[in-house]
């Protein structure tokens, strides 16, 4: 329920019902979700492929992220850059993102361009170009992105080191963007094998929300998408992360003005019943200036410039990560001590009904803000179908949150936010080299 849904009146959200979404599975295994919304003459179309860095292995890490880029570089019918050119010509825009578990392609366009978009999506899924010059060009782009977002980013390099330390067995160990040596050495066979298994119709959920009819969407899907042959899906990820038996620490020395500290705790996968209590816990601790951590660490003690907690959607058990930015002159140890004290207070002191209610309202407010737009609903429908196993759970968020008790929040705090279950990554500013 991450990044999700205040007291907005549900009667004003008549569209927020599972019956508004119609589904059909094509003969090649692609599942299509359609929600008609005729308020504006636009359409959001999202393709969720169940392929991410967890489906890679040492030697080929980063391939899923590579295809986030490569899918815009031409196919059999629509050549290099034509996807973007045609999209722009028709008044639309597009994007894509890659996670540990998924690669998602997003299209937003006028309803008049629906058939063109179906045709272009089918073209790149079925007949993506592997022109060697384009592959090498995109390899360079990805390598440059890695340098910018990881190697030359204090937060990026610390986050990468945190993941590598927190996961010793599971594929969440390596970064989504890939290790540098792997990016340099992918072969054409590596690329084609990964694309064939991951970007196949039977490994995809397509979501269409907007000024369309379900009949028109399915007719076009059967015309353009259904002829694409199914493929062998990615092999299941069998490796489970073993229980962590003690605190782990990693220190990064890097040129920086101020230290950074990331503190991670292993938590269950998204579809686990503890997801909702953990959402409330995370919100209670770090959502806004009235949250516990902000009031204690930013306002009262003035130890940090900012503090937040976050979890990502995850098909397998993941992490809750607390991020601390200590003020100038504040040792990271002082900041983390205050954090640990607040976590201890959460575990051992009663949570008031008022505080619990506030956290739930904040979550509902975030959720409904996303549900107001066709792009937000397309994204959430795909997330719930993939991560929760059923898009219909999107429409029971309020009931799920309402069932969370203060005792539930304290229970998950005691179960997961423990010393032996945490990994601490600290970036210590490195003094500038003196030149004699």
What residue ranges belong to the model's regions?
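Charge-rich, well-structured scaffold segments of protease-associated domains
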Residues: 25, 82-233, 251, 261, ...
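Short strand-connecting beta-turns/loops that link adjacent beta-strands
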Residues: 38-40, 200, 256-257, 316
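Sec-dependent signal peptide recognition
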Residues: 1-7
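Active/ligand-binding-proximal structured segments within catalytic/core domains
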Residues: 29, 39-86, 263, 273-285, ...
